[in-house]
Structures are given as C-alpha cells and as structure tokens.
Swiss-Prot record:
Source taxonomy: Bacteria, Thermotogati, Thermotogota, Thermotogae, Petrotogales
Gene Ontology molecular function terms on file: 5'-nucleotidase activity; UDP-sugar diphosphatase activity
Source domain of life: Bacteria
Gene3D superfamilies: 3.60.21.10, 5'-Nucleotidase, C-terminal domain
Family: Belongs to the 5'-nucleotidase family.
Protein name: Mannosylglucosyl-3-phosphoglycerate phosphatase
Keyword Translocase set for record: no
EC number of this enzyme: 3.1.3.-
Length: 503
C-alpha cells in the first residue's frame, strides 16, 4: 500500500511538472452607456453573453478559467435604460457573470442613492480605490478584489478618473476622487502580496495618440499610468471610448480598451506558469449580427425595454403655455422654448453661459402635460452637452459670427446667462450674468457637441479647451422641466436684441 501511494505521489508530481501553463481568458467591456439592447446590425449584451458562455465551456475543458470585467460608464445613453436607472444593464451583467466593474464618471450622473441601488441590483463588486469619503477617509466601495484560481491568483484594483470632479460634481456629496496614480502606488504592495497577476481596472482614458482634454483639474490617463507605475501587468481601461483593436504595450504593461456602446467585446488570453504570465494575446471582437443572442439575456432585457418604452410616456412636468419650437421661429428669433432649453443647460452643468443652435430644436410642446417622448421630439439628435472654457474674447467671436447669420438658418443662436445687442453685424453691450463681459476672463460655456466641434459654422469653437459631459440634451431638458414642475409662464426675454434685422 505504501509503495502504491508513493508511486501515486510521484505520478502526480510528474504530471504537475508537464501540465503546462494555466489558461485565463479575460473578457472586457467599457462605456456601454445603456446599450444593453442590440439592433439588427449587431451589438448588445445578449451577443456578448454568447461569446462569454462559449469561452467558459471551451476553457473549462482544459482546466482554465474566464474572467469578465467592465471598465465603467454603464449609465447614461439610451432612454429606455435611463428611465429605469440602468437596472436592466446591471441585472444583465449580473446574469452574464461579471466579476467586477470599475466606477465610471457617469455612475455619478444621478443621486448617490441611485448608485447604491444599482450596487444592490448588480451583486458584483464596484471597484474604486480612489473614490473616497472625505469625512471618514478611505474608499466608499471596494478598492480591489483577489480572484483565486487555485494554481494562481489575480488581483484587480479599480480606479476612476479624477475628471469626475468637474464632469459630474453635483452628486459626489461628501465623497471625492483622489489622485489615481498615488492611490495605485498605495494599494500595489498590498495586492502584490496576495496575487500573482495584477490588473488595474480603470476608467481613466487612453490618450497616447493625442486628444488629451484640457481641463481645470489634474488627472491621470491609462497610458501615463502604465508609463509611470511598475508592478502592474494589465490595464483594462475606459472613459475615452477608444477602440484598441489589439492591446498596446507600454513599459511592459498590456493596455486594452474596447470602444463603446456594446458594439465590441475585448478578449485577452493569458497563459500563466509559476505565477508569471508566460504568453498572451489580445483582440477586440465586433459584436456582429451573425453572433446569436443569448436567449435568456435577450428575453428578460426585452421585457425591460418594454417597461422603459412605456416610461417614455410618463409625465415629467406640465406647461400652462405653448412652448414654441416652430422651425421658422427658432431660426429667426428667440422663443420661450429655446430659452427654456438654454436655461436647462446652465442648470445641469453650472456653466456661466449656454449657446444653442436653432437648427437643433425640431418641434413645439403644446400646453398641458409634458412626456419624455415630447422632449425627444423637440431634441431628437442625441446631442450631448459640451462644456468649453472660453475667454471673453472667444465669446465675442462667437457672437459676432452669430450676428451675421440671416433669418431661417439653423445656426441661429440662442443663449442663456448672456445678453447682447446686435447691430450692423456686430455684438455690442454684451453682459454675462448682468456684468459687462471681460475679454480676458475665462468663462465656463456649455453648448452641444455638434456646435462645439464647429458645426453650423461655429468653427471658432473647434479645438477649444473643454470636455464632453455625455449628458444628452434631451435628458438635461427633461430634468430641468421636472425640477420646475409646472411652467406657469416662460416668455421670450430679448436676450439677443436685434437692433436691425439681418436678412
């Protein structure tokens, strides 16, 4: 018997030597923004679930494992999801077996109580090592997790962009976002003691190829993190909506990001031997229409879609006056509806000035109850609010261009926070919040992403410092109307007074 046991131990030892490296497959998504539902053209969580489940079956046969991660911004983008506080998104990720997600800045679009509800629904870790409570100090959610796979372990540290402090500050409350790199350096020794492989699940943004936003806050990007920090094996990133078709390697760190809107899913295959990555490969897989949708995920998310669609008919406010969005009117003069839209843009972002193009306003709202569907008819393009940092001189350039626009053009400018007189194709007597404009002062100006990119001839705005909030203009108007409750009267206020009409 003893001889038999000795032979058995010897065989096990020999097999372990020649067993080869362990196989770990990592699937990752980011910036899905409410796109839980696919279309006939592809995309959606149900198709992603099919690929993940297939890999689980295949890898299990060889004794490997699958890790599924999301790099943040589950929230905000599709009305049917937004109406339901992204509950269908988080439930779908739960049933898809998501192991963890990092917090994205759009997880703070709504009151903190909503995020807490989403956490309860999700039943998977929300990672954010640098999202801390200012009063008690320390992270609000889990800073990291350790996944033990028997022969090896993986540590996952979550980080959220410091940009959140200027992008979505309203609902941070007594919490804040602290320096991502400093936080990572604090947790790395702890995680390295417990794990063989270290992954940073980050919502920081990748800007190694340029396009780094110019903001009034210091922030870290994933490429900078890879360059500056040692001891990290992989950074799975989000926030910049970058499609890295194959991961890039920076300072021996694998950096991956999979685009946005659930159009793709990233896959990284690792082979791990003796606690080290000995080989890897990575790709981004487009979720094309030929990938079948997982029937369970599709079934229950379709039911939520119906609920969300019905929610579009829910009343968000009441107006006792006709809100004028007639094409001929908003392309020639300010109206009560254009003023309402611009006021809502300031209310949502805290900007000093709002700029809105008349061509973006596509319908009126009759007196009576206002539904979200009504609002989407007024603002149907899905444009997002874009905040720029403009000097007084920059604003004068905008106004002087607007002063040359003849009636009937979509570039007709509507404003909030600002008044001016237009005469002879020039803007004069310009005041911002009642005070004369200071040409050297920098102002916070909100417009939509179309105008910010130079649309409708506002080319002087293209390339100016600023950032996309990813707040849909329709959502901003909906929330502002809900805030007002009942619109008793919303008259035109002659914000841009045309002393001579440009025809």
């Amino acid at each position: 018997m003893k001889r038999f046991l000795g032979i058995l131990v010897f065989v096990v030892m020999v097999l372990s030597v020649f067993a080869g490296p362990n196989h770990l497959v990592i699937f990752h998504m980011n910036d899905t923004h409410g796109h839980v539902w696919g279309t006939e053209d592809g995309g959606g969580f149900a198709r992603a679930a099919t690929l993940i489940n297939q890999a689980r079956e295949e890898v299990a046969k060889e004794g490997g494992a699958v890790l599924f991660l999301h790099a943040g911004d589950v929230n905000t983008g599709i009305p049917e999801s937004d109406q339901l506080d992204a509950v269908p998104d988080f439930l779908a990720l739960h049933y898809m077996g998501l192991d963890a997600m990092s917090l994205g800045n759009h997880e703070f679009d709504k009151p903190f109580e909503v995020l807490e509800k989403q956490y309860e629904v999700a039943q998977f870790p929300f990672l954010g090592a640098n999202f801390v409570n200012e009063k008690r100090g320390g992270p609000v959610f889990e800073p990291y997790i350790i996944k033990d796979y028997g022969d090896f372990s993986v540590g996952i540290i979550g980080l959220v962009t410091e940009q959140t402090k200027v992008l979505e500050p309203i609902y941070l409350g007594e919490n804040t976002i602290v320096d991502a790199e400093e936080t990572l350096n604090m947790y790395l020794p702890i995680v390295q003691e417990k794990a063989d492989v270290v992954i940073v699940l980050a919502h920081l943004g990748y800007h190694a190829d340029g396009g780094r936003p110019n903001l009034s806050v210091e922030f870290t990007t994933s490429d900078e993190l890879a360059e500056n920090v040692s001891g990290v094996d992989i950074i799975i990133d989000g926030h910049s909506h970058t499609l890295l078709e194959t991961p890039v390697v920076i300072n021996n760190v694998i950096v991956a990001q999979a685009g946005d809107n659930a159009e793709n899913i990233g896959r990284i295959d690792l082979w791990i031997d003796d606690g080290r990555i000995v080989d890897w490969r990575g790709e981004v897989i487009p979720l094309t229409s030929d990938i079948p949708e997982d029937p369970f995920i599709k079934m229950f998310t379709d039911a939520f879609y119906q609920l969300g669609s019905e929610a579009l008919n829910e009343v968000v406010g009441v107006t006792k006056v006709y809100l004028d969005g007639e094409r001929a009117h908003v392309r020639s003069d300010e109206t009560n509806l254009s003023n309402l839209i611009a006021d809502g843009m300031i209310w949502k972002t805290g900007a000093d000035v709002a700029l809105m193009n008349g061509g973006g306003i596509r319908a009126s709202i009759e007196a009576g109850e206002i539904t979200y569907r009504d609002i989407l008819t007024v603002l149907p393009f899905g444009n997002t609010l874009y905040v720029l940092e403009l000097t007084g001189k920059d604003i004068m350039d905008v106004l002087n261009y607007a002063a040359t626009i003849p009636d009937g053009q979509g570039a007709k400018l509507h404003v909030a926070g600002l008044t001016a007189e237009i005469k002879g194709g020039k803007a004069t007597n310009v005041k911002i919040n009642g005070k004369p404009i200071d040409l050297n002062k920098t102002y916070k100006v909100v417009t939509n992403n179309y105008v910010a990119a130079g649309g409708d001839g506002y080319t002087m705005l293209a390339g100016k410092p600023g950032y996309d909030t990813y707040f849909r203009d329709a959502d901003s108007l909906r929330e502002y109307i809900a805030h007002l409750g009942t619109i008793e009267d919303y008259t035109s206020q002659e914000r841009l007074i045309e002393l001579d009409q440009v025809k």
